[in-house]
Amino acid sequence: MVLHDQGGACLAWLSLFHTLYSTPMPQIQLAVFDMAGTTIHDENSVAKAFQRALNLHGYPKVTLQEANEKMGYSKPQAIRDLLLIHEPDLEKITDSLIEEIHSAFVQGMVDFYANDPSIRAVADAEEVFEALQKMGIKVALDTGFSRDITNIILQRVGWADGRLVNASAASDEVPMGRPFPHMIQKIMAELGITDPKSVIKIGDTEVDVNEGHNAGCLMSIGITSGVFSEKELIPHRPTHLAKNLREVLQIVKAYELQAKD
């Protein structure tokens, strides 16, 4: 496992990689970023929406910590997991109940992302996207949100025109959300990319890291500026850790430099 937060430290690992393998190092063609907490500023808004939706349906004791632990998962799966904690009668945890709670959650999120003045990209996101594009690396987003919420966010931050973001995938567009690899695979197919070793994944939760591993990505980078801390991400074996998106760019630049040698 390789853990670091500086581009320079990456070179030692890359040199070892290059020594051990005689075949050329794969060229990075695609970077897939998570949205809320990774590229979109979030102040527990998603976790609070979970709390409100569950409270409306008779589950007032869901904590922010419990909700945050489910960040990154598809939202119906997150709701099911939270119900398993707070509903002792398992027969009451039906698909119908989950759908009702999810509908309330979606409506809350649609209203929030459409109207709240705090919605913005995280620091350096657009600069990092532009730098990757100039390096010939496509940029994509995947998310535990459904497509309707995803589209609202893309419109609010000005990423819907395809200039900075080449593709996106929402959890309701694939058979299984994270940590399954289906969203990354959908994006790869859309962009005509066939080798997962030319793809890197970046996200702030355990399921982001595991999604990257399950997709066979070259790198699965955990970013510690969101929900999960470095200590919480390490057990899930990220190939790299970064404190922010600027450090992600340093990691990519260091890899590209070594790949040219």
Question: Model-predicted segments: where are they?
Answer:
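Non-catalytic pre-domain segments flanking phosphatase-related domains
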Residues: 5-33, 258-261
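Substrate-recognition/cap helix-loop segment adjacent to the acidic, metal-dependent catalytic center
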Residues: 57, 82-86, 126, 133-140, ...
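N-terminal helical cap/lid subdomain that shapes the substrate entry/recognition surface
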Residues: 26-123, 130-135, 151
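Acidic, Mg2+-coordinating phosphoryl-transfer loop and its flanking beta/alpha structural elements
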Residues: 201-240
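Short acidic capping loops at alpha-helix termini that bridge into adjacent secondary structure
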Residues: 62-65, 161-167, 195-200
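Short acidic, glycine/proline-enriched helix-loop-strand junctions
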Residues: 232-246, 252, 259-260
